[in-house]
Amino acid sequence: MTVEIEKDGEIWTIIHNRPQARNAMDPVSAEELVVAFKEFDKSNAKVAVFYGEGGAFCAGWDLKYAQTLNGNRSNELRELDFPIGSSEPPRGPLGPSRLELNKPVIGAIEGPAVAGGMELALWCDIRVMAEDAYLGVYCRRWGIPLLDGGTVRLPRLVGQGKALEIAMTGRKVEAEECLRIGLCEKVVPSGHTREQAEIMAKEIARFPQDAVLTDRRSIIESRGLSVREGMKLEWVNGVDAVRKQGVKGAARFSAGAGRHGDFKKI
């Protein structure tokens, strides 16, 4: 097994543990990650942290495996084709990149998250990067295109022009630049990303989850909609959460809890 799950109450940390290969992704690891994240999505856990053991988040697709995809094995990639219709697609080349989970994932990024590893980082809801970590489309050098959602998620985060520049040059994008342009949400000292991601996960998990997940879903689903359509979606998604938890929360505030922005006693 190259994937481990550590459970701390409502927080799961899903660890890719293949440090001898800089956590490059082969089919075995890809399948194990899909199983782990599907298990998380079905569980009572509220937030997952995605971490690469050994100082590297993920160095991308395992090119030692990729070089074998010729001759009798050339059809293996076809097994990952999207199906006709709306049925669930097979896993991505790097595993969970095609999963649309119902709960948030925080990426804890140490060292390189490059090529397909960058695509996995972009799949996460939130990214916490070490100050010496970096992203980059390093597969540019080897003639391998982005296949795990990079061309979809990158421009949504940084805009089309910056996405094209990063993708076509294949250059290194260091943590501080990632923070500045919206590719990560927090930069922390090296060696502390998992710790800081788990702290953030616990902050998210302690809130009433109907509203947290409703707002997450509305933010994700409203992309591409007009303002009116987006606000209608927000209302449809959110009104039940108000009935389930919001009324009770308002009553607690009226009784004195959480005044003046105090989050300690909620």
Features from the language model and the residues they span:
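Hydrophobic alpha-helical membrane-association signature
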Residues: 29-32, 193, 234
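Short, active-site-adjacent cap segments at secondary-structure transitions
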Residues: 55-59, 114, 136, 219
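Short beta->alpha linker loops
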Residues: 28, 52, 61, 170, ...
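Terminal peptide-recognition signature
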Residues: 14, 18, 32-33, 50, ...
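An acidic, glycine-rich surface segment that forms the CoA-thioester-binding/catalytic face
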Residues: 30-34, 42, 63-110, 152, ...
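C-terminal alpha-helix plus adjacent terminal tail
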Residues: 1-9, 57, 75, 170-176, ...
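Crotonase-fold acyl-CoA enzyme core
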Residues: 96-210
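Conserved CoA-thioester-binding segment of acyl-CoA-metabolizing enzymes
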Residues: 1-55, 67-71
